[in-house]
Amino acid sequence: MGQKVNPVGMRIGITRDWTSNWYADKKDFADRLNEDLNVRQLLQKRLKGAAVSRIQIERPARNAKIIIHSARPGVIIGKKGGEIEALRDEIFKVMKVPVHITIEEVRKPELDAKLVAENIAQQLERRVMFRRAMKRAVQNTLRQGALGVKISVSGRLGGAEIARTEWYREGRVPLHTFRADIDYATASAKTTYGIIGVKVWIFKGEVHAPKPQAEEAAPQETEEEVK
C-alpha cells in the first residue's frame, strides 16, 4: 500500500497536517472548498517564479489567513510591499473576507520535495540530460542532511519514440513506515517532445522514534535475606 498511495496523504494526522484548516456547515462546505482551490490556482499562477513550496489556508472568525512558504520571499513581497498588497486585493475578490498574508521562508530548498521537483522540471525544459539532473538533485539533497531520496521521471526521455520511466535513489525511503517523515511532490516539464512527469520522495528521518525498552528492575531483597 505504501508504494502506491500518496505518501503525504497517507500520513495526514500522523506526521503531516492539513493545508486547509477551517470548519464549515454542510451547505457552505463546497463553496469554501472551491474558494480554496481558486486561491491556490491564483497564487501558483501569480507566484510562478517565487519558488513557492506550500500554501496554508486558515479561516478564523470571518477572516482568512494565508501562509505562503517560499524560498524567495522578496519576490512575493515586492518593493515596499506593493506586490503583496495587490495580491491581497485579488484574493479578497475570490474569498469575500478580509485576508491576512504571511510569508515564511524555506531556508533549505534542497530538502523540499516540491522545490526539488520544480527545479528538475526546469532543467529538463532547458534540455539538460535527465540522468544528470536527477543525480545532481539527489547529491544536493543528501548533502543538506536527508537520509534518503528517490526521483522518478516519466515520458519521452531524451526525445525517444517510446515513453518510459527512469528512477534514481540513494539512501532509505521507507514508504511503509507511518512515523517516517517523507516529503513527496510532483512537477511537469513541458518539452518539445511532450510532457515529462517528475516525482520526488525525500526521507528526513523518523518523527516518533520507538521508545527504548525499560531496564529490568533489580530484584528486591526479601526480609529473610536481610535477616
From Swiss-Prot:
What stretch or stretches form a coiled coil here?
A: none
Q: Which family does it belong to?
A: Belongs to the universal ribosomal protein uS3 family.
Keyword rRNA-binding on this protein?
Answer: yes
Q: Which Pfam families is this protein grouped with?
A: KH_2 (PF07650), Ribosomal_S3_C (PF00189)
Q: Which GO terms describe its biological process?
A: translation
| Gene Ontology terms: cellular component | cytosolic small ribosomal subunit
Q: Gene3D superfamilies per the record?
A: 3.30.300.20, Ribosomal protein S3, C-terminal domain (3.30.1140.32)
Gene designation per UniProt: rpsC
Protein name stated in the entry: Small ribosomal subunit protein uS3
Protein role? Binds the lower part of the 30S subunit head. Binds mRNA in the 70S ribosome, positioning it for translation.
Q: Indicate whether Secreted appears among the record's keywords.
A: no
Q: Which residues form the KH type-2 domain?
A: 39-107
Top-level taxon in the UniProt lineage: Bacteria
Q: Which organism is it from?
A: Coxiella burnetii (strain RSA 493 / Nine Mile phase I)
GO molecular function list: mRNA binding; rRNA binding; structural constituent of ribosome
Which keywords does this Swiss-Prot/TrEMBL entry list?
Ribonucleoprotein, Ribosomal protein, RNA-binding, rRNA-binding
- What is annotated about its quaternary structure and interactions? Part of the 30S ribosomal subunit. Forms a tight complex with proteins S10 and S14.
PANTHER family given for it? 30S/40S RIBOSOMAL PROTEIN S3, SMALL RIBOSOMAL SUBUNIT PROTEIN US3C
